[in-house]
A protein has these predicted regions:
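N-terminal amphipathic/basic-hydrophobic helices that include classical n-h-c signal peptides
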Residues: 1-13
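N-terminal amphipathic alpha-helix/helix-capping segment at the start of soluble metabolic enzymes
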Residues: 14-45, 161, 165, 303-351, ...
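Active-site beta->alpha loop and helix N-cap motifs at the rims of alpha/beta catalytic domains
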Residues: 16, 69-201, 344-457
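N-terminal glycine-rich anion-binding loops that anchor highly charged ligand groups
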Residues: 29-44, 49-68, 72, 77-80
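Short, acidic/polar
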Residues: 52-63, 108-112, 263-267, 350-356, ...
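A structural motif
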Residues: 66-71, 119, 211, 275-276, ...
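Catalytic alpha/beta core domains of metabolic enzymes, predominantly
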Residues: 140-153, 184-334, 418-420, 427-578
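C-terminal accessory/binding modules appended to enzymatic or scaffolding proteins
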Residues: 335-358, 556-593
C-alpha cells in the first residue's frame, strides 16, 4: 500500500517556533566535503554552459568556486554529456580545485549510471527517473498496480545505488513541483503531500539498501508550496526514522530584485526554523552572482544562534504544517479578509507623494511632524499626542489621520476617538494589561516590533500569546534595518527572510519596513510590496516565473527575459512563465497564467 498521510495530526511533531536551533541531520559525504550534521550550510550553484564544451564548463565552474561556491552542478542530459564530466572533473582538479561536482540527470536513468563514475554527486528527479514523461492524463491505479510501479522504481534504482556505493558517489533526490509524475499527481494531486510522497518513495529504497550519502530537495516556484512541502517532508521523515540533509531553493525565482526577494522569502522561512543544510539561490543571471546572495542569506540567519531563550507557548490550534490565516476582525481595511497592508515610514520630512502608483502604501507614518504636503485620500499615522492637533489643521483636509500609541500610553487609548488606532507592542509587555486593553478596544491594530536577536521567534511569541488569549485584533509586523543605499540587496534579503515564515504561518495583516540609512522610501515600499507578492499574499506587479538556465537552454535566456519584461511589465497581476527547457517548463508554467 502507498504511504498515507492520514495520521499526521496524531504523530505531528512541532519545531520550536520561538527558539532557533538547527535541525539535526545525518551527514552526506560528497567528495572533499561533508554536508549536514554540524557542518556549515553549504553554498552552491549550477553552470549554464554546454556540458560538451569542456573549456567553457571549467571556466564557469571556477568562477563559481572563486565566488565561494562549495558545490558546482552541471546538466547531463545524455550519456555524451555524462561522459564528458570526466574531462571537466580532470580540468578543474588540474587547476587545484577539489570542489565536488554534481551531475543533473532527468528522464534517463542510464545517464545517472554513467555520471556516477565521474562526479562526486548525482541528482536524480523522482518525477522522471523511471516514470514515463508527463502527459497530464488521468489514470486510476489499483493498489496492486501502484505497488508494481514502485517495484519498477526499486528494480532500476538499486543498481544505480550500487554503482554509487562502489565509486563513493553521493546522490540528491531532487523533487520539483513542476515535474511530478502523472502517477503521483493522479493519486495525491498537485499537492505538498504528492511532492513529499514522490521523494519518500526513493528515500525508503535508500534506507532499505543502507545507502546514506543522500541529500534531498523539494523545489517549487511557489514559495508557499515549497515551504509547506519541506516542512511536511521533515515531519514525514521523522516518523519513518530518517534525517537526511536538506537542499533548499526556490526554482524559477527569476532575476534582479524580484528573484532575490522570492528566494529569500522561501529559503529564509525554512532556514529561520533551522531547516536546511545547503542552499542554491536560482537566479536568471550569471551563476557566480548567485553565491553572494546565498552567502548573505545563510550568514544573516546564522546570527540567531545563541540567542536568549524566548519563553513562549504555542497556540494549540496553530498548524505549522498546514497553516491557515489567523482569524481577525477587520479594522478599517486591515485584517479580516483584506489583503495585508503596507505602511511606509516618512518621519524625516520626505514627500508623502508616491510616484510609483503600484507601490503606494496604504498608510504613511509621519510621527509628529507636518509633511510638506498631505495627499487627499491618503491615510496617515501620527503620534497619539499630536493626533487631535494635526487632525484639526486645514492642511489635513481630505487626508485621513489615525493615532499610534506606544505601550506605555495604553491607558490613553479610550480618550481619543478614531475609527482605527495603532498600538505598538513587543513580546514581554505585561500580558494582562495589553490583553485587557485589546479586548476592550477592537478598533486597535497591533504593530508588532522586536529588537530581539531572533526577531522571528519574538514576533511569533507575541501573536501566539494573543491567540491563546482569544484576541482577534489585526497584527502588522514592523521591521527595522540599518543599511546604506549601496546595501539595498542586503536590506531586501533580510526583510524578505524575516517576513517569510510570518507570512507563510498566516499571521500577517500588514508589513511596515523601516531603515536607518539612505535607502529611498520608495525603494523600501516597493520591497514591501515585492515581499507580499513573493508570499502570494498581494499582487501589485507582473510576476515572472523564469528559470536560471542551464546547459539545456539553447537560446539567450537573459536577453529574452529582458525583452519579455519590457513588453509586459504593465500587465499588473499577470504571472508569466519563461522556461529554458522542458524539464520543469510545463509543470512550473501551470503556476503561471
Amino acid at each position: 500500500m502507498p504511504h498515507s498521510f492520514g495520521a499526521y495530526l496524531i504523530l505531528y511533531i512541532m519545531v520550536d517556533l520561538f527558539n532557533y536551533t538547527r535541525r539535526a541531520s545525518s551527514v552526506a559525504h560528497i567528495g572533499a566535503i561533508d554536508l549536514g550534521g554540524d557542518n556549515p550550510i553549504r553554498i552552491q550553484s549550477m553552470t549554464t554552459t554546454n556540458t560538451n564544451d569542456t573549456e567553457a564548463c571549467v571556466r564557469q565552474a571556477e568562477e563559481i568556486i572563486k565566488a565561494g561556491g562549495e558545490l558546482v552542478r552541471f546538466t547531463t542530459q545524455g550519456s555524451r554529456e555524462a561522459e564528458n564530466m570526466k574531462n571537466i572533473n580532470a580540468g578543474i582538479r588540474a587547476d587545484g580545485y577539489q570542489t565536488p561536482l554534481v551531475a543533473d540527470v532527468h528522464f534517463n536513468p542510464n545517464v545517472a549510471d554513467v555520471a556516477a563514475l565521474y562526479c562526486e554527486k548525482v541528482r536524480v528527479n523522482p518525477g522522471n527517473y523511471v516514470d514515463p514523461a508527463r502527459k497530464f492524463i488521468k489514470q486510476e491505479y489499483t493498489d496492486e498496480e501502484y505497488a508494481h510501479e514502485l517495484q519498477k522504481i526499486e528494480d532500476r534504482f538499486v543498481p544505480f545505488l550500487n554503482i554509487c556505493k562502489e565509486h563513493h558517489t553521493a546522490i540528491r533526490i531532487g523533487v520539483n513541483h513542476g515535474s511530478l509524475s502523472d502517477r503521483i499527481r493522479n493519486r495525491y494531486g498537485d499537492t505538498p503531500e504528492g511532492i513529499v510522497e514522490s521523494c519518500l518513495e526513493f528515500l525508503r529504497i535508500c534506507k532499505k539498501e543502507n545507502f546514506h550519502d543522500v541529500v534531498i530537495s523539494i523545489k517549487s516556484s511557489n514559495t508557499v508550496v515549497m515551504v509547506r512541502s519541506m516542512r511536511l517532508l521533515v515531519e514525514e521523515m521523522e516518523k519513518e526514522g530518517m534525517n537526511y540533509p536538506l537542499h533548499l531553493g526556490v526554482t524559477e525565482a527569476g532575476e534582479g530584485e524580484d528573484g532575490r526577494i522570492k528566494s529569500a522569502v522561501g529559503i529564509g522561512a525554512l532556514l529561520a526554523d533551522g531547516i536546511g543544510d545547503t542552499v542554491r539561490v536560482s537566479l536568471s543571471e550569471e551563476p557566480a552572482a548567485e553565491i553572494p546572495v546565498a552567502r548573505h542569506l545563510v550568514d544573516y540567519i546564522g546570527k540567531k544562534k545563541g540567542h536568549l531563550m524566548i519563553p513562549a507557548t504555542a497556540c494549540p490550534s496553530f498548524d505549522w504544517l498546514r497553516p491557515t490565516r489567523r482569524e481577525t476582525v477587520a479594522v478599517g481595511n486591515i485584517g479580516g479578509n483584506n489583503v495585508p497592508v503596507v505602511i511606509s515610514n516618512r518621519i524625516n520630512g520626505e514627500s508623502t507623494v508616491c510616484e510609483n502608483k503600484d507601490a503606494t502604501p496604504d498608510y504613511i507614518y509621519i510621527g509628529g511632524k507636518m509633511p510638506k504636503q498631505f495627499v487627499p485620500g491618503q491615510s496617515y499615522i501620527v503620534d497619539y499626542n499630536v493626533y487631535e492637533t494635526l487632525n484639526s489643521k486645514p492642511e489635513t483636509t481630505g487626508a485621513k489621520l489615525y493615532p499610534i500609541f506606544p505601550a506605555m500610553a495604553m491607558p490613553l487609548i479610550a480618550s481619543i476617538k478614531a475609527d482605527v488606532k495603532f498600538l505598538t507592542l513587543q513580546f514581554g509587555t505585561p500580558a494582562e494589561e495589553y490583553i485587557a486593553c485589546l479586548k476592550a478596544h477592537p478598533e486597535v491594530v497591533v504593530i508588532c516590533v522586536s529588537n530581539h536577536q531572533n526577531r522571528l521567534g519574538d514576533q511569533r511569541a507575541l501573536v501566539h500569546e494573543m491567540m491563546n488569549a482569544g484576541l482577534k485584533n489585526p497584527v502588522v509586523f514592523a521591521e527595522m534595518y540599518q543599511h546604506g543605499k549601496e546595501e539595498k540587496s542586503d536590506f531586501q534579503l533580510e526583510a524578505a527572510a524575516d517576513m517569510g515564515a510570518l507570512m507563510i504561518d498566516g499571521l500577517t495583516d500588514g508589513i511596515w519596513l523601516m531603515n536607518n540609512g539612505d535607502i529611498p522610501a520608495q525603494t523600501i515600499d516597493e520591497t514591501a510590496f515585492g515581499i507580499l507578492q513573493a508570499a502570494r499574499l498581494r499582487t501589485s506587479r507582473t510576476e515572472y516565473i523564469s528559470c536560471p538556465g542551464c546547459g539545456r537552454t539553447l537560446y539567450d535566456l537573459r536577453e529574452t527575459i529582458a525583452k519579455i519584461k519590457e513588453a509586459t511589465k504593465h500587465l499588473k497581476g499577470l504571472k508569466i512563465g519563461i522556461m529554458g527547457c522542458i524539464v520543469n517548463g510545463p509543470g512550473e508554467m501551470a503556476d503561471a497564467d
